[in-house]
Amino acid sequence: MMITKQSYKKLALMRVFVFSLSAFIFNTTEFVPIALLSDIAKSFEMESASVGLMITLYAWIVSLGSLPLMLLSAKIERKRLLLFLFGLFIVSHILSVVAWDFWVLLISRMGIALAHSVFWSITASLVIRVAPIGRKQQALGLLALGSSLAMILGLPLGRIIGQMLDWRSTFGMIGGVALLVALLMYRLLPSLPSRNAGTLSSLPVLMKRPLLVGIYLLVILAISGHFTTYSYIEPFIIQISQFSPEVATLMLFVFGLAGVMGSFLFGRFYEKNPKKFIACAIILVLCPQLLLFSFKHLEWVIFLQIFLWGIGITSLGISLQMRVLQLAPNATDVASAIFSGSYNVGIGSGALFGSIVIHQLGLGYIGFVGGALGLLALFWFNFITIKFGAK
């Protein structure tokens, strides 16, 4: 019996690992254009700010597609659905590799975004289902760790491959790794019937929960602020701080490494006081942005700011995801779809705001605008906490 229990625990951990690796792949491909922005712009003879709108397009497709596509797929067995999503993901990356102009690249990114919109709508609840008994929070933490590793390994490696070969090779490598992940899913995951996915009728019920709605608005505000600055951090480091491309790569690595710390801190401290944890995470996101321009030429200060910023954004994302699941236990997939949509409204809006700031004011001002949105997010969080009695 002991061997059976140990075998079950090992298999469950392997399944959680597959989901964590999947999160790594999806987050890497969503954000790797940030690390390749200058190279993509150069290859198509465009400005970085204009190419940055591909981040906005991707995010807004996810925002618009998350809920309706989740509802359309609500009754589909989850393992089969995941394998279909990875098939679409891989084919779209092949199109990215052969893209002969910027519009074809955008079309390929649309396919990836559609897969992304369903994947993140169902993954949080699935990783909890396959987790070892009593390890649900840790499983969610490992899922967040996969996302963080995308920043630690995915973005820097994507940038290195882009510099050594070209940006197309980066997308090709991501597609190849995705194929391996799909094979692991096919091999390791059991049949996963749809459960507590929720239906269209769940929406009015969820929208009557003011704290939940407030959390969604908080996500939009906080993530918009973050991506106003982060979407253009690579050109900021090179053009404004005037650091070398190698330093920019290292800073992206540090940002992702900080995400591991954020995942650890979530597992250690979130349950003790969720309100204070979320507030501290917001502060860690907004302060480095507000101070970014002031210390633009002090390399060690920028490294420190980026490290704290990375801790903050990872801690914030996973804690808000957990809060949503806690507030909507009877419709987890619908609630997660709205969360994913809200998050990507923030990504798209942030990338758009950043582009507008660059064109109207200049690249150096992105941190001020991003930080100001972060301040609004902090005020909003304090308001909904007091108004609706967050526990």
UniProtKB/Swiss-Prot annotation:
GO terms under cellular component: plasma membrane
- List, alphabetically, the PANTHER family matched: PURINE EFFLUX PUMP PBUE, SUGAR EFFLUX TRANSPORTER
**The gene coding this protein:** sotB
Q: Which UniProt keywords apply?
A: Cell inner membrane, Cell membrane, Membrane, Sugar transport, Transmembrane, Transmembrane helix, Transport
Give GO terms: molecular function aspect only. Answer: carbohydrate transmembrane transporter activity
What name is this protein filed under?
Probable sugar efflux transporter
The species this protein belongs to is Helicobacter acinonychis (strain Sheeba)
Q: Which NCBIfam families match?
A: PRK03545.1
Entry-linked Pfam families: MFS_1
Biological function = Involved in the efflux of sugars. The physiological role may be the reduction of the intracellular concentration of toxic sugars or sugar metabolites.
The record's family statement is: Belongs to the major facilitator superfamily. SotB (TC 2.A.1.2) family.
